[in-house]
């Protein structure tokens, strides 16, 4: 599908058509809303091929895959989440809404079914025990349903995601305490690529969960490598581990804003963390890839000769650099110096938080032994 944008009284109208090359899509919240409206229209009017829904600041025209009656008072509709130019695991996923008319005038109840996750930990926008359908999608569903709901009726709306349990392990839900499915998300109705605010917001929620569970000493990792090795080496709870992806600066800034975090241990593979020593707080390779330059500079600071520096500079991977450092018996000295600089820069930039930096190899070897001794987590 693609998105056609036109002006509507200063806002936007977005029409959705098939074309996976588009940069933006629509959120699971918008898909669930469209399916709910279509199911209601099946009951009170006629089955639509498309529906128009109102999202915050936008109007969306969404194609309906199928509608059917379950009984005289209940209908269901299926909407497929459009493809767009992003590695979103929910692209192409079907969302089903089952709408049942009730005699409880004007009262709309929203619940979940198979494939919609349940919240098990505090700190999220939804209370523990509830289905993980976020406030904005709930509001969107209610407001759009009210446009078509007969005056004397209420409605029970059940959202189902057939592939939700299968997709859930590919999302961050388990880290946030959402089990048995995925979440219905969205704040604007439009899904942006993962480099956008929508993605960084999803990372930030981890901080809220950690604080809600009483953790003030947190371990920030770039991704799966850091998480895996931290769990192998340290005694800590899942909620103490915060994934920051490439957005180091954003996540540290958000942590600093809370005013509640005592310490942050930056823990991860050398290829990511060393960039921070050069003041690079977005570690995405296409944004800044100065690994060779950083490693060459720090090797020079500890006295590496010209040939060694030349060899380091011509390496392709950080792991290759480490082999050269090992051959020259300067690995620990180089990485301890880099870790010191990381701590110095972060401490200056985010005052009031105690920082530590632990740099590791792919195989889990600790490259900064003195730093890991000082972190506020027990070692295994």
Curated annotation (Swiss-Prot):
Pfam families: CbiD. It comes from the Archaea. Keywords: Cobalamin biosynthesis, Methyltransferase, S-adenosyl-L-methionine, Transferase. Coiled coil: none annotated. One of its GO terms (molecular function) is cobalt-precorrin-5B C1-methyltransferase activity. It catalyses: Co-precorrin-5B + S-adenosyl-L-methionine = Co-precorrin-6A + S-adenosyl-L-homocysteine. InterPro entries: CbiD, CbiD_sf. It is an enzyme of class 2 (transferase). GO terms for biological process: anaerobic cobalamin biosynthetic process; methylation. Pathway: Cofactor biosynthesis; adenosylcobalamin biosynthesis; cob(II)yrinate a,c-diamide from sirohydrochlorin (anaerobic route): step 6/10. Its EC number is 2.1.1.195. Belongs to the CbiD family. This is Cobalt-precorrin-5B C(1)-methyltransferase. It comes from Methanosphaera stadtmanae (strain ATCC 43021 / DSM 3091 / JCM 11832 / MCB-3). The gene is cbiD.
């Amino acid at each position: 599908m693609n998105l056609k944008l036109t002006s509507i009284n200063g806002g936007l109208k977005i029409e959705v058509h098939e074309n996976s090359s588009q940069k933006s899509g629509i959120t699971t919240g918008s898909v669930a809303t469209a399916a709910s409206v279509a199911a209601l229209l099946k009951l009170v009017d006629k089955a639509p091929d498309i529906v128009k829904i109102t999202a915050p600041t936008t109007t969306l025209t969404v194609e309906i895959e199928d509608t059917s009656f379950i009984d005289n008072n209940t209908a269901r509709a299926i909407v497929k989440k459009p493809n767009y130019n992003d590695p979103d695991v929910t692209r192409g996923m079907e969302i089903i809404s089952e709408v049942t008319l009730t005699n409880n005038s004007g009262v709309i109840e929203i619940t979940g079914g198979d494939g919609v996750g349940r919240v098990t930990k505090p700190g999220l926008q939804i209370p523990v025990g509830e289905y993980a359908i976020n406030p904005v999608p709930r509001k969107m569903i209610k407001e759009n349903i009210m446009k078509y709901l007969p005056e004397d009726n209420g409605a029970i709306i059940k959202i189902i995601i057939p592939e939700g349990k299968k997709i859930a392990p590919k999302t961050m839900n388990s880290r946030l305490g959402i089990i048995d499915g995925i979440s219905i998300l969205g704040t604007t109705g439009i899904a942006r690529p993962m480099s956008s605010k929508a993605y960084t917001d999803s990372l930030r929620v981890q901080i809220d969960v950690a604080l809600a569970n009483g953790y003030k000493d947190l371990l920030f990792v770039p991704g799966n490598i850091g998480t895996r090795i931290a769990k192998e080496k340290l005694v800590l709870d899942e909620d103490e581990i915060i994934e920051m992806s490439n957005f180091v600066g954003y996540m540290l800034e958000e942590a600093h804003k809370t005013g509640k975090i005592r310490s942050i241990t930056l823990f991860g593979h050398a290829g990511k963390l060393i960039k921070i020593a050069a003041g690079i707080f977005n570690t995405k390779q296409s944004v800044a890839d100065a690994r060779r330059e950083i490693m060459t500079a720090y090797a020079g600071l500890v006295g590496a000769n010209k040939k060694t520096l030349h060899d380091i500079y011509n390496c392709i991977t950080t792991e290759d650099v480490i082999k050269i450092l090992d051959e020259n018996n300067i690995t620990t000295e180089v990485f301890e110096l880099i870790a010191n600089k990381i701590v110095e820069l972060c401490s200056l930039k985010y005052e009031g938080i105690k920082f530590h930096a632990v740099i590791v190899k792919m195989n889990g070897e600790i490259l900064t032994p003195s730093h890991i001794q000082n972190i506020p987590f027990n070692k295994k």
